[in-house]
């Protein structure tokens, strides 16, 4: 089988293209990355890419391929017209624009990082507001300081019409459940906006350097670890109305949640911070995207967590993206018309306040 880096997945047998079978309701791709060159220019030379697990734990073959991918996809990552053409070919009415993962800059130890984050949010907002019929935007946050991050949330939501924020699942040595981030979760709840969790490799990735394992295994593993901490460290308990939206189908935990419930029932050290419910009950409050590639895995997520908690996404424009998200949903057996409309756009419209 030939390699198709930016086309249909070999993870399933495809049916009719989604553009031909799409529902009449609004379709939304809720996981799409946009590169902000102005921010990259600001931090140039201020950090070592080897501080980022996705780069540090990659062999030379992977590194070379990733460099080529950025060259191949630079127009998709930066050019609105290129993006709109792709959306039209997929049958996507609206994209949720999200920063590229390595532009979180949590490892930049400088005031310049705050300026870079502000620049990213301003440019994302500008891009979305210039085409309100096709885009909304999620921002990013200066996670070096939880108080400054909370203030940036207020600015972005109140002044820029930002609809939520992407946060990387591990923050330069700190878990997302760290007390210094409590204000972020409280502010997200107050503003009634979702937080999108996205990985960027796995920090303990020595065994994952070959075969792109740092992404294939490492990304869902890092997400899995982050969700465990948010649940067991009490973040979800303390913030019952917090809306968490998770990339790549939520990593490994949604498919193996009975293990955390078993541990919670069997061991006192798994009781966490006064958890009032089974760990999986907190997981069921979260939302998961559809980037799992196979029909059976998507059907499992829908059956286990409800169609109202599954949100269509692609991870555009990378080679690990889902190229035909509508076909993926439409080809999943046993879904009702209402479920299809929720997953392909309705849930995203509710989460991100899209009219």
Functional labels for PLM-detected ranges:
Residues 110-114, 214, 327-330:
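Short glycine-enriched, charge-decorated loop/helix-capping segments at active-site entrances
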Residues 104-106, 149, 203-210, 320-322:
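Short acidic/His/Gly/Ser-rich catalytic and metal-binding motifs that mark active-site loops
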Residues 102-129, 147-155, 175-186:
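Active-site loop-helix segments enriched in His/Asp/Glu that coordinate
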Residues 143, 199-203, 316-318:
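Short glycine-enriched loops at secondary-structure junctions
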Residues 24, 33-77, 203-221, 260-283:
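Active-site gating loops and adjacent loop-to-helix segments of metal-dependent hydrolytic enzymes
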Residues 89-99, 203-204:
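Short coil-to-beta-strand
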Residues 1-26, 30, 37-94, 122-130, ...:
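Mid-to-C-terminal alpha-helical segments outside catalytic/metal-binding sites
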Residues 3-10, 128, 132-134, 154-311:
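Catalytic pocket-lining loop regions of alpha/beta-barrel enzymes
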């Amino acid at each position: 089988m030939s390699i198709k880096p930016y086309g249909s997945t070999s993870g399933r047998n495809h049916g009719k293209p989604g553009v031909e079978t799409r529902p009449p309701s609004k379709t939304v791709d809720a996981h799409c990355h946009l590169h902000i060159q102005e921010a990259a220019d600001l931090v140039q030379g201020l950090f070592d890419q080897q501080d980022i697990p996705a780069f540090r734990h990659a062999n030379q073959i992977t590194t070379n391929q990733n460099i080529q991918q950025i060259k191949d996809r630079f127009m998709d990552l930066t050019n609105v017209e290129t993006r709109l053409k792709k959306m039209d070919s997929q049958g996507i009415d609206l994209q949720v624009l999200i920063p590229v993962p390595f532009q979180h800059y949590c490892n930049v130890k400088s005031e310049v990082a705050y300026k870079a984050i502000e620049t990213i949010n301003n440019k994302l907002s500008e891009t979305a507001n210039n085409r309100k019929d096709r885009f909304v935007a999620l921002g990013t946050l200066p996670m070096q300081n939880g108080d400054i991050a909370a203030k940036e949330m207020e600015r972005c939501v109140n002044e820029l019409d930002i609809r939520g924020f992407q946060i990387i699942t591990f923050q330069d040595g700190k878990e997302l459940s760290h007390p210094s981030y409590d204000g972020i979760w409280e502010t997200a709840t107050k503003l009634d906006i979702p937080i999108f969790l996205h990985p960027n490799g796995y920090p303990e990735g020595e065994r994952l350097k070959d075969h792109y394992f740092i992404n294939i295994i490492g990304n869902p593993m890092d997400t899995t670890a982050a969700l465990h901490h948010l649940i067991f460290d009490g973040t979800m308990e303390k913030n019952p109305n917090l809306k968490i939206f998770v990339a790549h189908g939520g990593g490994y935990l949604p498919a193996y949640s009975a293990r955390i419930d078993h541990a919670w029932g069997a061991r006192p050290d798994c009781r966490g911070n006064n958890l009032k419910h089974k760990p999986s009950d907190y997981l069921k409050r979260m939302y998961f995207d559809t980037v799992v590639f196979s029909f059976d895995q998507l059907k499992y997520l829908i059956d286990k967590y409800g169609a109202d908690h599954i949100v269509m996404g692609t991870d555009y424009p990378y080679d690990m993206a889902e190229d035909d998200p509508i076909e993926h949903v439409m080809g999943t057996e046993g879904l009702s018309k209402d479920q299809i409309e929720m997953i392909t756009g309705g849930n995203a419209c509710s989460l991100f306040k899209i009219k």
